[in-house]
Amino acid sequence: MRIVFAGTPDFAVPSLRSVTQRADVVAVYTQPDRPAGRGRELTPSPVKLEAVARGLPVYQPQTLRSPEMLEQLRALRPDLIVVVAYGVILPEAVLAIPDDGCWNVHASLLPRWRGAAPIQRAIEAGDTETGVCLMQMEAGLDTGPVLMSLKTPINAYETSGQLHDRLAEMGAQLLSDGLGLLRAGLRPVPQPQLAAGVTYAHKLGKVEAQLDWEQPAERLACRVRAFQPWPVAEVVLCGERVRIHEALALDLDHSQPPGTVLAASKEGIDVACLQGALRLCRLQREGGKAITAADYLNARRDLQVRA
């Protein structure tokens, strides 16, 4: 089976490895090298690095819509195109090239959380379950029928980064299982997505990192986990803007205005919210590194506590 693989970030690397064990990967498509780091040097994608290490042909077109790119893809004669977090919407002309169509590994239980940030939005919303889907691609954004899926609970203190790594491996396993069925002539049966359950996972933005104490503690705790490792939640704490890397929601009654420090100890700094309180466990001052609440308190002797 001849497969063209299209993917870009770390999430796609386990799936690329999985495909190479199941089929003949005739080409890998990934986004062009981008400036990164303080020096803004051109940096290859994780998928490109993996493909080069495996000796696979790599293509990095700016667009898939030009006649030249379409002809290049047709010349590869793929039986199937596998897409995992490629970051480019495939035009219908590309979807029509392989006999078996195009498969996509998506990090949610579709139709919930279609779009760019399904992992982060699931945690932000307080979902207790998520998973990965293998989808038959069509022209719409994550609208195609689901071929297979795997479910998993979202752990109470799991961050987006941790869930990302788990789902990447689950997606690779699901893809391997799907390819195994296809090779055996047992093509997975497409199941149309139900319109009633559709939600959209819009792309994250830095502006969302600013937390507002005028919200329930549970919601803020979910956002701290969702925005880890990027963009990292930020709050104003007694006049200082700090980033929050770890926090817990406390179910307690208080009569203080949101943003008031209720208690401070080596376990954390408890801040009043609209409902309950948020315990800040790991913080980062501007220009510094992430530190424990105890270390932060040693540096902030002026912190005022109101019981």
From Swiss-Prot:
Enzyme class name: transferase
PROSITE patterns per record: GART
Keyword vocabulary terms for this entry: Protein biosynthesis, Transferase
Family the entry assigns: Belongs to the Fmt family.
The EC number(s) this enzyme carries: 2.1.2.9
Molecular function via GO: methionyl-tRNA formyltransferase activity
Protein name: Methionyl-tRNA formyltransferase
Pfam families on file: Formyl_trans_C, Formyl_trans_N
Reactions mediated catalytically: L-methionyl-tRNA(fMet) + (6R)-10-formyltetrahydrofolate = N-formyl-L-methionyl-tRNA(fMet) + (6S)-5,6,7,8-tetrahydrofolate + H(+)
GO cellular component: cytosol
Binding site for (6S)-5,6,7,8-tetrahydrofolate: 108-111
NCBIfam families hit by this protein: fmt
PANTHER family: METHIONYL-TRNA FORMYLTRANSFERASE (PTHR11138), METHIONYL-TRNA FORMYLTRANSFERASE, MITOCHONDRIAL (PTHR11138:SF5)
Cited Gene3D superfamilies: Formyl transferase, C-terminal domain, Formyl transferase, N-terminal domain
Organism: Xylella fastidiosa (strain 9a5c)
Family matches, as InterPro entries: Fmt, Formyl_trans_C, Formyl_trans_C_sf, Formyl_transf_N, Formyl_transf_N_sf, Formyl_transferase-like_C_sf, GART_AS, Met-tRNA-FMT_C
Parts of the chain that traverse the membrane: none
Function per UniProt: Attaches a formyl group to the free amino group of methionyl-tRNA(fMet). The formyl group appears to play a dual role in the initiator identity of N-formylmethionyl-tRNA by promoting its recognition by IF2 and preventing the misappropriation of this tRNA by the elongation apparatus.
